[in-house]
Amino acid sequence: MVVEVDSMPAASSVKKPFGLRSKMGKWCCRCFPCCRESGKSNVGTSGDHDDSAMKTLRSKMGKWCRHCFPCCRGSGKSNVGASGDHDDSAMKTLRNKMGKWCCHCFPCCRGSSKSKVGAWGDYDDSAFMEPRYHVRGEDLDKLHRAAWWGKVPRKDLIVMLRDTDVNKQDKQKRTALHLASANGNSEVVKLLLDRRCQLNVLDNKKRTALIKAVQCQEDECALMLLEHGTDPNIPDEYGNTTLHYAIYNEDKLMAKALLLYGADIESKNKHGLTPLLLGVHEQKQQVVKFLIKKKANLNALDRYGRTALILAVCCGSASIVSLLLEQNIDVSSQDLSGQTAREYAVSSHHHVICQLLSDYKEKQMLKISSENSNPEQDLKLTSEEESQRFKGSENSQPEKMSQEPEINKDGDREVEEEMKKHESNNVGLLENLTNGVTAGNGDNGLIPQRKSRTPENQQFPDNESEEYHRICELLSDYKEKQMPKYSSENSNPEQDLKLTSEEESQRLKGSENGQPEKRSQEPEINKDGDRELENFMAIEEMKKHRSTHVGFPENLTNGATAGNGDDGLIPPRKSRTPESQQFPDTENEEYHSDEQNDTQKQFCEEQNTGILHDEILIHEEKQIEVVEKMNSELSLSCKKEKDILHENSTLREEIAMLRLELDTMKHQSQLREKKYLEDIESVKKRNDNLLKALQLNELTMDDDTAVLVIDNGSGMCKAGFAGDDAPRAVFPSIVGRPRQQGMMGGMHQKESYVGKEAQSKRGILTLKYPMEHGIITNWDDMEKIWHHTFYNELRVAPEEHPVLLTEATLNPKANREKMTQIMFETFNTPAMYVAIQAVLSLYTSGRTTGIVMDSGDGVTHTVPIYEGNALPHATLRLDLAGRELPDYLMKILTEHGYRFTTMAEREIVRDIKEKLCYVALDFEQEMATVASSSSLEKSYELPDGQVITIGNERFRCPEALFQPCFLGMESCGIHETTFNSIMKSDVDIRKDLYTNTVLSGGTTMYPGMAHRMQKEIAALAPSMMKIRIIAPPKRKYSVWVGGSILASLSTFQQMWISKQEYDESGPSIVHRKCL
C-alpha cells in the first residue's frame, strides 16, 4: 500500500517501523550525515545523544543514509564515497522496511518534499481487488447457502423462502440477495425480488447487492435490481458507487444502464475521483470516451486538485491526453502543489505528451489570433494608415519623420480634409501672390514691395470700390481656370480672399517661429515666382484697360505697403479725375520711355509667367495622381472587405449545414437507442413470462401429463419427465446380439439385448452402437432403444405423452424426418419436438447467448448461439471425444507392462479413466514433475485384487483432447476449435461469446478442464478480451436438464408438432416447426 502524503498524520496514528520512530525521533540529526546541521532535529539540550543503541545504529547507517532512505536520495549530503558498500544485506533489509515510512517516521524529513513517494502519493485501489466474497460453508445458514450455490431445486427454494426471513444477515452482514447477486444466481435473485426483500441493505463494507452484482460483472442480476428500484448512488466505505465499479471493469453497457437509471456521473469517492477521473487514472480509454460523450465534467478535481488531464499525464497515457485535448480542456489548470500538466509531463520525461501539449497550445494561439482579427477593422486600419501616411508627408519635418502618427478614426473624412487643405493652400497661394500682403525683405518668401515710378501728383480714378471688385472677379476667374476640381459652386470671392489671407498669415507665423517647411506635393514658391505671377496678373488687367491710358497696373502691383491693413486687402486710394490731370512734355517723353521699358519687361514677365503656369499644371497632375492612388487603395480595401464578408457568409452556411447533419445523426442515434431499449424490454418481458410459466408448470404438472424428454447420445441415453432436476433413466446406448445361436441354453434366449443388460452379457454378445459420432446409422437398433426407454425404463405408454427428442448440431434432414416418422407412426405419440443439444445446454446455464463446447462419447461440437438460435456457419465438428480415450489409455498403459485386451478389461480401463484421470494445466511442467517425484502417482485395485500404479498416464490420456496428434489425428484441439468457431462468428457478438463459453457433456467432466480451457483460449484471444469459462457441476446431464426446462414452459405446446399437423403435412413439417 502506497503512503499518501497529502497531510501529516498525528504521531500516534503513524505506523512505527519496527519500533524505530520512538527511539530515533530525537537523535535523527545526530545519527544521519544528511541531517547534520540541518536544524531539523527535535533534540533538546537535555537529549540523550550517547545512547548505546543509537551509537550502534549510527555507526551502521552513517554511510548508507543517502541510499537507504527515499527522502535523502539525490540530496548530495551523504558521506558515502564511490567505494561505499551499498549492497550490504542488513541495509538492504532495513531499506526495504523503512522506505515507505521515511517521511512519517523521521522528523528531519517531514515536509521536506524529498521523498520519492510523490508529492501527492498514489491512490489505493484495494477497493477493486477480489470482488467476489470469500465464503465458508460453516458460516452460512440454509438460505444463504442456497443463495450462494444455487443448487437447491426451485420448489424447495420457494418453500424455504416462506419459512425464513429473506432479509436475514450473516456474520459479514450479507443477505441472501448479496450472495445470489455476487455469484450470478439470477433465478434466486428473481425469487427474492418477488418476495419484496430489502434492496439497499449494506454488508460489512457498506455495499449493496447492486454494487456486488456490478463489481462481479453479473449484468443480469444488476439489471433485475435496477428494475426493482435499487439506488445506484449509494457509496460503499471507499466512497465508490456502482458507476465507479462499472468504469473500473470497463463495462460500458452496464455504465450506460446505470446512467439510464439515474446514476450520478459526478459522484466522488474518498479520493475525490469521479467516474471519469477513475477511468483516466486506470487508463480505461474506451469508458473515458464514453463518459465524455455523456457530458461528464472534464474540469472535475480530485482531492489533490488534479484534473483529468493532469492524471492522464501522470499515468503517461498519450492516447487519453489526446482525447482530452480534443475536448478543449484547460491545459493551464494547476493542482494543489502548483504544477500544471505540462510540468508533470516534462518532469516525467513524457516527450510524446509534451509534444501534444505544445501543438495544442500553438493551435489555441492561432485560433485566438484568428478570432480577434476583424475584416471591417482591418479595412478601417488600412485606410487610416494610408491617410496618416499622406498627412505625414505634408506635416513631417525634413530631418525626422514621426514614428507614432496620429490615427484618424475615419479614413474618408481625412481624405476630404486633405483635399480641402490642398485647395485652401492653392487658393491662398494665388491670392497672396496677387495681393502683396505684408512687407518683407525677401528672405521670408514674401512678395517684395517695389518702388513706385509714378509721380507723387499722379491722379487715379475715384471709383476705387469698382477697381476692388474687378480684382476680385479677376482672381475668381483665374482660380476657376487653374483648379476647377477644388472650387465650389457657391463660393464667395470676398470670403475666399479673406480665408486665403488668413491661411497665409498662419503660414508666415509658423515660419517666424522657426518651424521647418512642409514637405507637401506642391512645389516651393520663391520670390521670383511671386513676382512673375504678380506681373502676369497685372498684364492681363492692363490689356482690358489699355484704352484708358491710366497707370493702374503699376499701382496694382506697387500699391500695397507693409503694415497697411491687417485684413490683407488692398487699401483704398484717393480719387483723381482724369479731366484735371495735366502732363508736361518732358513728362510725356518720360512716360513713353517708361512705357516702352515696361512693355519689354512685361513681355519677359509673360514668358516667365507661362513657365510658372506649366509648373502649376505639373503640380496639379501630381496631386491628382496621389488622390487617384488613394482612391484605388480604398477600392482595393473595399474589395477585400467584400470578399471576407462573402467568405464569412459561406462559412456560416457550412456551419449551419454541419449542425443540421449533427442534429440528424443525434436523432438517428436516439431512435436506435430507443429501439434497443424496446428490444431489451421485450426480451425481459419474454424471459419473465417464461420463468412464470416454468414456475406454474413446476407446481401443477405431474408425471401423468408431463412431457417425456429423451436425450440420445452416442454413448449414453438419458430419459425422464419434464420438470425434474435430473433424468430418471441413464443407460448405455448399445444393442447386443448373441454371437452364436443356442449359446445360452437352458434359458429363454432373446433376439437382442439393450442397455445395461447388454453390457452385463458383453462376453457372449456382439455389441453395437446405433449412433456413431452423433449421427444415427442403424434405425432398427435405435427403435429398440426407444422402445426400451418407454416400456422398460420409464414404464409409460408413449401414446399418452408428448415427446421431446434431442439431436446433434447439423443433423441431416433425412434423419430428422425419420425420427419424426417413427415417433408418430410406430409409437403413436400425440405430439413431439426436436431440439438442438447445444441450445439446451445453454438454457441450463441461464443464458441465451454464448458458445457451447459439447463433448460427449462420440463427437465434439462447438456451437455459437445468439438469442437462442444456433449459428450453423460458425458451428464446427471434431470427431474426437470420450470413446477414443480408453483405447489410448490402454495403449500407454502397456508401456508400464499393463495389458488390457478383452471387452471386460476395456470397461476396467474406462473406469480408470473416469476416476483417476485429470487435465494438466501445463503439460510439460507436469511431465517434469512426474519424472522427478512420485507425488502424482495413484493406485487402482483391479477386480481380482491386484493393485496397479498409474503415473503420468493420468494426464497424458485427456491431453489427447488438446493435442490430437497423440492419437495420430491431424486436426485442431478442442480449444483451437472453440476459438475458430468464435472467429467465424459476427464481430459484434464475439465479446459475448468469449465471456459466455459453456462446457457440456461427459468428456468435459475431467478435473482441471475449465482452467485449461481458460488458459488456452486466453492465449489465442486478443489480450484485452475477457475470457470466462462456465462449467456447471452437472454438465454431464446439462442437455437433458435444458430439455426439461424447455418442455416445462407453458409455451411449449405452441412449439411442438401435433399428430394432426403431421397427418396434414407429413415428416417434412419438422423443418418448419423445429428450427
Swiss-Prot record:
Q: Where is this region: Actin-like?
A: 702-1075
Q: Where is this region: Disordered?
A: 369-530, 544-596
List GO terms (cellular component aspect): actin cytoskeleton; actin filament; axon; blood microparticle; cell cortex; cytoplasm; extracellular exosome; extracellular space
Could you list the residue ranges forming a coiled coil in this record? 399-435, 642-698
Tissue specificity is: Expressed in breast cancer cell lines (at protein level).
GO BP terms, alphabetized: axonogenesis; cell motility
GO: which molecular function terms? Answer: protein kinase binding; structural constituent of postsynaptic actin cytoskeleton
Q: Report the locations given in the UniProt record.
A: Cytoplasm, Cell cortex
Q: Supply the Gene3D superfamilies for this chain.
A: 3.30.420.40, Actin, Chain A, domain 4 (3.90.640.10), Ankyrin repeat-containing domain (1.25.40.20)
Q: Cite the entry's keywords alphabetically.
A: ANK repeat, Coiled coil, Cytoplasm, Repeat
Ranges of Polar residues composition bias in the record: 485-494
| Pfam families associated with the record | Actin, Ank_2, CCDC144C
SUPFAM superfamilies annotated for this entry?
Actin-like ATPase domain, Ankyrin repeat
PROSITE patterns in UniProt: ACTINS_2, ACTINS_ACT_LIKE, ANK_REP_REGION, ANK_REPEAT
Q: Which family does it belong to?
A: In the N-terminal section; belongs to the POTE family.
Q: What is the additional note? A: Results from the insertion of a beta-actin fragment at the C-terminus in the POTEE paralog gene leading to the formation of a new functional chimeric protein. This insertion occured before the divergence of the Old World monkeys and apes.
**Name of the protein in its database record:** POTE ankyrin domain family member F
Q: Which gene encodes it?
A: POTEF
